[in-house]
Amino acid sequence: MERVIVYIDGFNLYFGICDKGWRRYLWLDLPALATRLLTPGQQLVATKYFTARVRADPGKIRRQSTYLQALEARGGLTIHYGRYQERTKQCHSCHAAWTEYEEKMSDVRLASELLRDAYSDRYDSALIVSADADLQPPIEMIRLDHPLKRVVAAFPPARDSYHLRGIAHEYFRLGRARLSKSQLPPAIKKADGFLLRRPVEWQ
């Protein structure tokens, strides 16, 4: 069997789904989605999800926290965290200042795991759910140093990358069917009995 690890760029997938107007598909069962991306003769070795905890917006914090707890309760994946970095910006005209947050390190962690797993021979094929062109260099390294390994790019909805199309062995786009069939149950019970419910904004 061909060993496959699926690497999911959380924010690239999230914003692609939102830009497509498909928020009802955000309650994703990621291991189930990863399984649906396999072809006959392939075996899912691991599902790795890369994200960062959002800041500033209470609604987004609540929804993300519920979702991450639901994923952890279901199991079947590992979650790798980057961080949100605070930046102060200033208007050049009126000199007003405000705080913005930008996500850092998620793509670096994904690239690092992708390379580490290749050099440790943990997969035969890597399937990357992302259209982030910054992933081109690690894919180039894998193709150079591990010519028998394959890297496949699965572009989230409303996302594309000329650079990844040029360097990945194969690429395809995630469509509505796979997303709609890979939803978590409406409510998930944690080990302590607490029920995590799908956010109303995602229904």
Please place each PLM-identified region on the residue numbering.
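Domain-level signal for Mg2+-assisted phosphodiester chemistry and nucleotide/NA-binding surfaces
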Residues: M1-Y101, K149-R150
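Nuclease catalytic cores that cleave nucleic-acid phosphodiester bonds
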Residues: T78-Q203
